[in-house]
Amino acid sequence: MKIFAAEFIKSCLAPEQFPSGALQEVAFVGRSNVGKSSLINSLLNRRDLAKVSRTPGKTQAVNVFQISTSDLHLSQFYLVDLPGYGFANVPKTVRNQWGPLLESYLLGRTALIRVVLLVDSRVVTDQDRQTMAWLRSIGHDPLIVVTKVDKLKTNERVRTVRQIHQSLGVADEDAVIPYSSMTGEGRDRLWGSLREAAGRRRDV
């Protein structure tokens, strides 16, 4: 699959700023500093489309990118980068803004075909588990992407993925994808899962 174009569209600080139109949407959510921006750049084969920050919690808005590919089901779609959660040093006023913004997006987007929950391969936190439970409670069945697996030894990866399945209550082996933004491991699997989600939506 070829990526013809990937461009930043807007940052949304309020629900009325969310994109309108008929394009399908894929949303990425995860803990601050989980490697979300690096993964997005890797997935789209772009160096700095999503800005990578050394300061956790830097993403404070719903950032929208428009993607064009050669795939029939994903020829045009929005990739949505949601604010990272769980970083204590972010001002409380900002954190209080994130919650309603995230909830409004995840509850109200009929074009949303897949939520991708990113978890760090080195630790699954209580907030990760709470986010997983909340997403399920509002009708989403998140795809789990385990980031930074290049930092683990081969034998550690198998054990880590098994533990994440258990910790998040995910039985489907295909619903957890180990990913490395450094090596590209997991990239094809992630694209495959997104194509399947888009295909299912078209068949409905």
Descriptions of predicted regions:
Residues 18, 59-64, 77, 83-113, ...:
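Switch II of P-loop NTPase G domains
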Residues 65, 147, 190:
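Residue-level signal for inorganic ion chemistry
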Residues 1-87:
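Conserved G1/Walker A P-loop phosphate-binding module
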Residues 22, 48, 61, 75, ...:
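Helical mechanochemical/support elements of P-loop NTPase systems and associated helical scaffolds
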Residues 100-174:
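Conserved C-terminal guanine-recognition region of P-loop GTPase G domains, centered on the G4
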Residues 3-16, 151-204:
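Canonical P-loop GTPase G-domain recognition
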Residues 69-73, 109, 200-203:
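Alpha-helix termini
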